[in-house]
């Protein structure tokens, strides 16, 4: 299973997108670098930071871009 996260950057900034489980444990860092302004997307293939597949369930993802921070839920189905 894969999922695509889409976001829009109004200006060039450092972006960090991290996936967490429902207990707040970090599962996967998807992006952690500076990106140019524009419409962006990143694909998560349900693999954690250690290269292991994760279980189906509810996950949180947090997008940090400059001063902007947003945390949202997603459901991973297998």
What is each residue range found by the language model?
Residues 6, 12-14, 31-66:
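Short, surface-exposed loop/turn motifs with a glycine/proline- and acidic-biased composition
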Residues 68-72:
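Extracellular and select intracellular beta-sandwich modules with Ser/Thr-enriched
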Residues 1-12, 19-25, 56, 75-78:
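Surface-exposed, proline-anchored Ser/Thr-rich loop/turn motifs
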